[in-house]
Amino acid sequence: MLHIRSWTLPKSSCSTLIWNRGFSKAPVLQVAKVIAVQDKKINLDREKHIQRIQERIEKIPISNYRNFSIVAHVDHGKSTLSDRLLELTGVIQPGAANKQVLDKLDVERERGITIKAQTCTMFYHDTNTKEDYLLHLVDTPGHVDFRAEVSRSYASCGGALLLVDAAQGVQAQTVANFYLAYSMGLKLIPIINKIDLDAADIPRAMDQVETTFELNREDCIPVSAKTGLNVENIIPSIINNIPPPQGDINKPLKALLVDSWHDPYVGVVMLVHIVDGKMKKGMKLLSAHTSKKYEVKEVGVMYPDKTPMDVLRAGQVGYIIPGMKNPREALIGDTFFQNGQHENLEPLPGFEEPKPMVFVGAFPADGGEFKVMNDHMENLVLNDRSVTLEKETSNALGLGWRLGFLGSLHASVFKERLEKEYGAKIILTAPTVPYKIVYKDGTEKVITNPDEFPGADQRALNIDHLMEPYVKAIMTIPDEYIGVVMSLCENNRGIQNEMEYLNTGQVLLKYELPLAQLVEDFFGKLKGATKGYASLDYEDSGYKKSDIVKMELCVSGIPQDALSQVMHRSQVQSRGKEYVARFKEYLKSQLFEVAIQAKVNNKVVARETIKAKRKDVTQRLHAADISRRKKLLERQKEGKKQMKASGRVHINHEAYQAFLRRSD
């Protein structure tokens, strides 16, 4: 009897596992031949498919290229609209299996956000002019934490679709990304999405587009990305309004790095926009910013997955495999030249290395899993060069890491990916931001760890002042909540810059806020104050002089390094009382009295006391034996004094975990 067990692999490979239990090999060979024929047929079909795509691209002039992006607030339907456009151009088939095609990460699909920039090549045949067009959709992140990907993606585009929810109207992220796209010279096409909703108010959304962005309401295209209604009107508008790329295939190669990711089999895969010239397999590349050299192993387009091509031409957005082993060499916004033909060529403008703005300590929940967790951490960092990773040691939590992120959402996504993809359990300390120390001699130092914060004696001797980072926050709220939101901003040390009433019952508020306040769940408080109707976006606003101090949490006089925090002096009293009261909940009683103190510059600002356990040493005494009773109680009291002087409080690992978990 022949037993055959098989499973489905990707189309490029067909594999079957066969066991023959002592019988004739002839049936096995016949099955193997069938499989070989099927494999060959699949490969031939794929080669023909690739050849057809390649031939079609070759026939399209650069004047018929259109590179575009989609500007939208979170959950306004950007990924859904991308799916409809891919279906409309025949890249994918309609169906639930092809949902959020350009969101490759699980966390992107679950949260409904885009984290990594992606692209897809599409063909469109204009039935009126009988011409073919090559479209490149560059799907960008919308959140400010991933602004590096956004700006580089916009740099590869000639225009963008400005997506507005017909029910919610213009939101903060829409405004922030509009200004970024507008400042980069992109042609914007307003799209009013979700017109199928009962709450949709199309005229109101059009009014907001006209008043907020000064775009003609007549240019708005009302669509439903969910049902596909009117989506077919978008591509003709793209062709008629968005200009083609201005590249020249005959000039020396100049390519912009839009994004990159790490593939365990081929190394780094880079998403590039060919500005001038062409790129093909075997070409030697030179990085403008690292001066490192690479040899191209493969070039291709995303259709929607990697599809190898012979060449990428000026104007195209595609992928290359450069033989790069270290992902940290792939710098977003870097320019690549052909080695030997780069003399007198200037790198493309706008390159800026992403700077981490939120730092946390990370420790394994089980200290014995540090080595395994370290491997997981390094693997994840391979795919995200904007994360900084350094090992550190805590007296309280043991071995761990100091991680730097672009923002609080970035940190949250990283933690979620670590837990979901590797099953890791991790503890994050309270987030801190990069503070700046300005010394009396004019030199500066940036600190990202509370342990590096100078003591009172050091500050008095050679430090002139301290500075903290600020951000420009943009909020859109219903006008009925304006009072409570302004109070929230002022309580978080905000400085009002601008207030604009939109003509639809919405208010646009612009505040300067300390970044430290923003990462402490400011958005959660904003949502709570407005019953979920507020939206928020922000951008860097530089450093301002500030009265910053370090608060230590001490148990029996011993500082707990993992619980130290840097904050503004105005927060010390309230935060100190809150911390000592909360930490008291997780400590067990000792045989001696335990003091939990919050200290600033060695001065106690808040205190809680855990009373000592008491053993009844008089239980066997006769009621009338008063002198003996006093003697035993005095001896017990003296013993507890000695224990308090020499004893050390043992704090369970679980106490730190519980306290920090509540601080998240």
Swiss-Prot record:
Its EC number is 3.6.5.-. Residues 63-246 form the tr-type G domain. It catalyses: GTP + H2O = GDP + phosphate + H(+). Keywords: GTP-binding, Hydrolase, Membrane, Mitochondrion, Mitochondrion inner membrane, Nucleotide-binding, Protein biosynthesis. One of its GO terms (molecular function) is mitochondrial ribosome binding. One of its GO terms (cellular component) is mitochondrial matrix. It is a peripheral membrane protein. SMART domains: EFG_C. Promotes mitochondrial protein synthesis. May act as a fidelity factor of the translation reaction, by catalyzing a one-codon backward translocation of tRNAs on improperly translocated ribosomes. Binds to mitochondrial ribosomes in a GTP-dependent manner. PANTHER family: TRANSLATION FACTOR GUF1, MITOCHONDRIAL, TRANSLATION FACTOR GUF1-RELATED. This protein may be expected to contain an N-terminal transit peptide but none has been predicted. This is Translation factor GUF1, mitochondrial. The gene is GUF1.
